[in-house]
Amino acid sequence: MKILVDENMPYARELFSRLGEVKAVPGRPIPVEELNHADALMVRSVTKVNESLLSGTPINFVGTATAGTDHVDEAWLKQAGIGFSAAPGCNAIAVVEYVFSALLMLAERDGFSLRDRTIGIVGVGNVGSRLQTRLEALGIRTLLCDPPRAARGDEGDFRTLDELVQEADVLTFHTPLYKDGPYKTLHLADETLIRRLKPGVILINACRGPVVDNAALLARLNAGQPLSVVLDVWEGEPDLNVALLEAVDIGTSHIAGYTLEGKARGTTQVFEAYSAFIGREQRVALETLLPAPEFDRITLHGPLDQPTLKRLAHLVYDVRRDDAPLRKVAGIPGEFDKLRKNYLERREWSSLYVMCDDETAAALLCKLGFNAVHHPAH
């Protein structure tokens, strides 16, 4: 049995070699000749999986080590009898911590407390719900917008997007990309919505580029009305609007979900799915794969305030480290993908063990995802 894996999928060779012969290949584009001699294909979001890629090949299973699946024609795979698995929620924590890193940076720069802000979360799935939990642990007011969940009668106080535009100081988008249908998210933030944003609002897009109308956003920024913008995703990736990048506060190369833990979760989830598909079910403990982090233990004296949280969060991951490299190479063909391929190792907050002499600080850090313990001072 031969399994093709994206060369940038961590731990893929190590895991899938337990099931068969593994060949690592580039994800964009996948070499067609390899597909003609393989049984399974494991991809990331850069690979478009559809009839034109797989028709006539012996591939009988596709796994994507990503939460999003808009790069996969699931209907065609089903019709063709090809097994499929994604990795829902694999990088949700990474995206939440990206949003926090950006918000804590902007709060320090502009001198505001997050507790004084109302944060509107658009899309309350794996990412949005975790973001809500962590924000509320800090006592921050959140407003939720998720029309499909509201229509299903899911538990939660769901608002309309209009209400979020009127009331929220931060709008952060965490939806899938739906190009049509009743819950279309293509240009969910369209020209009308962007024009209506209050001065000083923070707009964050870390889901899919086309959820926000990039041309309309640039027009608003060029009009000189104050708006803080954080973009990890862009229309037309890997090509992006360089003028828009120059106008935003933070711009990164679709890496919000790129923690080592998130990537490893993605690989292990599709590995477990494929092992079950071929009747050789296996489970993988994530901690057995991960190396020791750069920083792994620290002592915190006293209570946890916003500046201290920012320093702890940025000790693990400061979003600015990914903003500067993109600005340096923006507009040069191939560089966007290169930044993603050669991405510096990044860990999640759970990799940092924090000893606190303040019991309340330890409890709060645990709720925020840090590995914290109360250690009374002697």
UniProtKB/Swiss-Prot annotation:
Subcellular location per the Swiss-Prot or TrEMBL entry: Cytoplasm
Subunit structure: Homodimer.
Name recorded for this polypeptide: Erythronate-4-phosphate dehydrogenase
Pathway where this protein functions: Cofactor biosynthesis; pyridoxine 5'-phosphate biosynthesis; pyridoxine 5'-phosphate from D-erythrose 4-phosphate: step 2/5
Lineage, broadest ranks: Bacteria, Pseudomonadati, Pseudomonadota, Gammaproteobacteria, Enterobacterales
EC number: 1.1.1.290
Alphabetically ordered keywords of this record: Cytoplasm, NAD, Oxidoreductase, Pyridoxine biosynthesis
Active-site residues from the entry: 208, 237, 254
Gene3D superfamilies: 3.30.1370.170, NAD(P)-binding Rossmann-like Domain
Function description: Catalyzes the oxidation of erythronate-4-phosphate to 3-hydroxy-2-oxo-4-phosphonooxybutanoate.
Reactions this protein catalyses: 4-phospho-D-erythronate + NAD(+) = (R)-3-hydroxy-2-oxo-4-phosphooxybutanoate + NADH + H(+)
HAMAP family, per database record: PdxB
Xref: NCBIfam families: PRK00257.1, PRK15438.1
Binding residue positions for NAD(+): 146, 175, 232, 257
Entry GO CC: cytosol
Keyword NAD: yes
GO molecular function terms noted in the UniProt entry: 4-phosphoerythronate dehydrogenase activity; NAD binding; protein dimerization activity
One example of a Gene Ontology biological process annotation: 'de novo' pyridoxal 5'-phosphate biosynthetic process
Family: Belongs to the D-isomer specific 2-hydroxyacid dehydrogenase family. PdxB subfamily.
